[in-house]
Amino acid sequence: EKYNATDAERSYQEALDINSRYVPALVGIARVVGDERSLQRALAINPNSVLALETYGQLLLMNNRQEEADDYFERVLTLNPESLKTHSILAAQAALNQQDDEYAEHFARVNSFSPNNPKFLGDIADTLGNNYLFEEAVEFARAAIESDPNYWQGYTLLGNNLIRLGEEEEGKANLEIGFENDPFNVLTSNMLKVFDTLETYTTVESEHFKVNLSETDADILWPYLEPLLEEGYETLTSKYGFEPESPILIEVFENTEDFAVRSVGLPDIGPLVGICFGKVVTLISPDTLSANWQEIVWHEFMHV
């Protein structure tokens, strides 16, 4: 829950070393590493474990196995019609698919046993944000905080999605509120550390772009990057007949971990070297890459 996968995995393994049939630890391991076998074992021990069924459904959903996932969620609600997590998952899926009636049904059912539950709203905000619906995620995060101003995860969700929209000042302010009241949330802590890095960076601007980058990159890279960006803007807006709202914010990071944290909140992002959030693009400095950086810049701008 605090995005500290390393410590969580170690703690779950220590519990399993004591009792290898301890279902919550088997489920916990599965949540951390995505291990289906641990969930299968948990359900072999207790076929009616709501936690195991719920987690299995989430894992299947993440792997685009929607129909199988729905079967598990249906089993959960048969065992526990008031499962907040399952209702939030299904409500979020309905919101993603613009199934207003289905969303309203889950919202009403949750309100019947837990009115204005902030975690329900926060879970939906998290799902929407992870699916690049940042404005909608911001709305749900604000609603979660309005429901319970002491729901600190709501501030992290709000801040994270605001900065993906380029609203960095308000985003940072909300992250700081979240961190001050929940300092063990690794995602919040990581994001604020990236802001410390950005404070050492230089901001340069062109006609359609605002770019944050290190002083070294500002001296060496910017003379090449500025015409590349503006050429891309002119070419692609002409080609697609669409002019995005400007200035478009681009952040170029020297450190791959800073790039990963700014992009997803955690320091491991795999092989990705650039991400577009619509109004914001994050990139790794070409100093750290062997790939064609010009192609990467144009590719990410095409997503804008």
Q: Where are these predicted regions, by residue range?
A:
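Juxtacatalytic substrate-recognition/specificity segment
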Residues: 10-11, 37, 44, 112, ...
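Structural signature of tandem alpha-helical TPR/SEL1-like repeats
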Residues: 2-14, 31-41, 63-75, 96-109, ...
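TPR/TPR-like (Sel1-like) alpha-helical repeat modules
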Residues: 160-186, 193
